Amino acid sequence: MTTSRRKAREIVLQALYEQDLAGHNAEDVLKRLLTENPQTEENVEFIFRLTNAVVKHKDLLDENIRQFASAWPVEQLSYIDRNVLRLAIFEIIHENDVPVKVAINEAVELAKSFGGNSSARFINGVLSSVSKALADTANQREE
């Protein structure tokens, strides 16, 4: 069963994908997607906030992808993988109410649903590296 937040993340991913692939305005895409897939008011706020944040911080998120998936140029990643990573990295770094393991799991599920055969494994590996680096940084601050 698809959770409410998972469906919201699917809509965010679809908007990011369409913007990345076709250059369409993400907010316009969201409006269309939300007409086709009505959501609760809470989810609509979550969807717009998350989409706008990922779009706004795309360059910084891509730098994170370059750092943690250095063997894979961001521009050569599939549109789905690239946007799943952007979304998840944003959630891991900036969404304090989303546990890291949940953000990773949600990203892996998105990759399974929308990505290629090896997408889920790739996404999991990159995000595990991001998570470990954040944990290492937090531990260094505590010392």
Swiss-Prot record:
GO terms for cellular component: cytosol. GO terms for biological process: DNA-templated transcription termination; transcription antitermination. SUPFAM superfamilies: NusB-like. Keywords: RNA-binding, Transcription, Transcription antitermination, Transcription regulation. One of its GO terms (molecular function) is RNA binding. Belongs to the NusB family. Involved in transcription antitermination. Required for transcription of ribosomal RNA (rRNA) genes. Binds specifically to the boxA antiterminator sequence of the ribosomal RNA (rrn) operons. This is Transcription antitermination protein NusB. It comes from Dehalococcoides mccartyi (strain ATCC BAA-2100 / JCM 16839 / KCTC 5957 / BAV1). The lineage of its organism: Bacteria, Bacillati, Chloroflexota, Dehalococcoidia, Dehalococcoidales. The gene is nusB.
